[in-house]
């Protein structure tokens, strides 16, 4: 039987220090929050759609993610509450977009880095 943990404690101080120093410059909390927000497959599809087309109405998004308008609206409200999406009303239609360029850039970076990665 193979054991997937170290059988002895042997710490490489240089590696540990290097990684800890690097972690001080990484926005770990922000990245963690984005991963939590994107932990739902439907929300990932919605965000991807909003990256592809800058703005989409709820009906189009529901069709894209193959969900009801009600379920899609629920996810969109969640994304808005988390600061990821904005909306505007135009007559009887509601259009959603990503909140700003900073959000767009961070999410694009995350999604592009995971293309083709098998989990």
UniProtKB/Swiss-Prot annotation:
What does the record note on quaternary structure? Homodimer.
A GO MF label: metal ion binding
Q: Give the DNA-binding residues.
A: 58-77
Q: Give the residues the record marks as binding Cd(2+).
A: 6, 10, 57, 59
Q: Does the keyword Ribonucleoprotein apply?
A: no
Protein name per UniProt:
Cadmium resistance transcriptional regulatory protein CadC
The answer to whether the entry has keyword Lipid metabolism is: no
Pfam families hit by this protein: HTH_5
**InterPro entries associated with the record:** ArsR-like_HTH, ArsR_HTH, HTH_ArsR_DNA-bd_dom, HTH_MetalResp_TranReg, WH-like_DNA-bd_sf, WH_DNA-bd_sf
Residues in HTH arsR-type domain copies: 23-118
**Biological role stated in the UniProt entry:** Metal-binding repressor for the cad operon. Involved in resistance to heavy metals, such as cadmium, bismuth, zinc or lead. Metal binding causes the repressor to dissociate from the DNA.
- Keywords of the record: Cadmium, Cadmium resistance, DNA-binding, Metal-binding, Plasmid, Transcription, Transcription regulation, Transposable element
Signal peptide bounds = none
Q: Which top-rank group of organisms is this from? A: Bacteria
